UniProtKB/Swiss-Prot annotation:
SS bond partners: none
Protein name (record): Ribosomal RNA small subunit methyltransferase H
Binding-site residues for S-adenosyl-L-methionine, renumbered to this chain: G35, G36, H37, D55, Y79, D100, Q107
EC number: 2.1.1.199
Species of the source: Nitrosospira multiformis (strain ATCC 25196 / NCIMB 11849 / C 71)
UniProt entry keywords in alphabetical sequence: Cytoplasm, Methyltransferase, rRNA processing, S-adenosyl-L-methionine, Transferase
Any one GO BP annotation for this protein: rRNA base methylation
SUPFAM superfamilies associated with the record: Putative methyltransferase TM0872, insert domain, S-adenosyl-L-methionine-dependent methyltransferases
Length: 316
């Protein structure tokens, strides 16, 4: 089993191998976390290789800055600013980018971060604790309609209406400031007979609030086109997602990028327009990869992981 408080990197070998590393290449780890993927990438890069890592979490950035490797640059920022940051660093194009989405084990297991429904802590849930509103602040001000929409859309929770109503009633009695308060409210709002086996009833609601507050899906949608724009021909995009909302975005993006049937019908086009519409920007590399039985047994959080890989083509 994974050690509590320690982040066990999911699909570590598979993800780094999927990057098809060149010793002198330039790579981006868009979600540094606790540096599992970055460490292995650096081990395999040559002396002239470079790795730029992004993370919104100040604690993660502190870990990265302790590396002491001149080939490595730690950036306190969302990967959704990838293109802007790389240009600031005078980097033209890159050989590969890795995105390991979601929340890390240390974030979940640090009670003060407020991500976990199983630990008593303040309702925070921010990836970047230096900016933005906390979960407690949002829960205090959101309308019942907004609560329902967020829980339904980002948590895919069929009892979103009942949960939203329960939150509004509860906050009228006292402020909602702790994870245990919210978890209890959600649990009480879901009929016992409708609860999913082996899943805490608060799972989907906590996921929804976290995704909404941190704009996780919006940032992913912003980042993917930037990744492709910055990749050299033959460069790899590797994305590990942990729930269907993320994976849907990644799968659709890669599929659309690989689609060569983009010519508008019955329209006269110039030669440059024909090239622009007919050329794919990506090709899929293999099938989706999931953790094996042994990895899931050692790290149950790996169970829902899905890795998709694409390669940049036709950059001219």
């Amino acid at each position: 089993m994974a050690e509590a408080g320690k982040h066990t990197t999911v699909l570590l070998q598979e993800a780094v191998e999927a990057l098809a590393l060149k010793p002198d290449g330039i790579y981006v780890d868009g979600t540094f976390g606790r540096g599992g993927h970055s460490r292995l990438i650096l081990e395999r890069l040559g002396k002239n290789g470079r790795l730029i890592a992004f993370d919104r979490d100040p604690v993660a950035c502190a870990v990265g800055r302790s590396f002491g490797d001149e080939r490595f640059c730690m950036v306190h920022s969302s990967y959704s600013r990838l293109q802007e940051v790389l240009r600031q660093l005078n980097i033209g194009q890159i050989d590969g980018v890795l995105l390991d989405l979601g929340v890390s084990s240390p974030q979940l297991e640090e009670a003060t971060r407020g991500f976990s429904f199983s630990m008593e802590g303040p309702l925070d849930m921010r990836m970047d604790t230096t900016e933005g509103q906390t979960a407690a602040q949002w829960l205090a001000s959101a309308s019942e309609v907004q609560l329902e929409e967020v829980i339904k859309e980002y948590g895919e929770e069929r009892f979103a209406k009942q949960i939203a109503r329960a939150i509004v009633k509860a906050r009228a009695r006292q402020p909602l400031v702790t994870t245990s308060q919210l978890a209890a409210i959600v649990a009480a709002a879901i009929p016992a007979r409708a609860r999913e086996p082996k899943q805490n009833p608060a799972t989907r609601t906590f996921q929804a609030i976290r995704i909404y507050l941190n704009q996780e899906l919006e940032r992913l949608s912003l980042a993917l086109p930037q990744c492709v724009e910055m990749l050299k021909t033959g460069g790899r995009l590797v994305v590990i997602s942990f729930h269907s909302l993320e994976d849907r975005i990644v799968k659709r993006f890669i599929r659309e990028g690989a689609n060569t049937d983009k010519l508008p019908k019955h329209l006269p086009l110039r030669a440059d327009e024909v090239r622009r519409f007919s050329r794919a920007s990506l090709q899929m590399v293999g099938k989706a990869v999931r953790p094996g039985v042994a990895e899931v047994e050692c790290n149950p959080r790996a169970r829902s992981a899905v890795m998709r890989v694409a390669e940049r083509i036709n950059t001219t």
